[in-house]
Amino acid sequence: MTLDEFNRLPPEQAREALLACAHVGRWADEVTAGRPYASVEDAARAALDAADPWTDEEVDAALARHPRIGERARGESADASMSRSEQAGVDTSDDDVTRRLAEGNRAYEERFGHVFLIRAAGRSAEEILEQLTERLGNDAETERANAARNLREIAALRLKGTLSA
């Protein structure tokens, strides 16, 4: 949809479009209430501002909607489609990469209690594996901040993509 179309949507429909970007109700409400936006960049900036900070509960809600890196999101929802597009650069045809991602995902989830989240768009599988390995050495507080930062980046990129369609 275009920015103009987004600006004119009824609030409930704008909120639904935003929830596909990040499943955080307060955030979607705040970005919806900020309309109309003069540019896609203004909308993305408002999305980043509304997401900083997100509460632990909001981060958990958004993380619950993200598949593991290297696993394709299932279903036909807008957020599943966005996730598949974002992970398109992760080559899962290489068995070694797939194995290393699966092992890293398991280790990460055991250590931190949630999926490993990274802005996958524009990153290779090797870059993602490098970050996964590095972030496994973080303490829980640092990693929570990393997850929240990546969620904010993903939400803003998804919104830009939605409003550029």
Task: Put a short name on every predicted segment.
Residues 1-21, 25-107, 153-165:
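Aromatic-anchored, charged helix-turn/loop surface patch used as a conserved interaction hotspot
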Residues 93-165:
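C-terminal non-catalytic interaction appendages of large macromolecular assemblies
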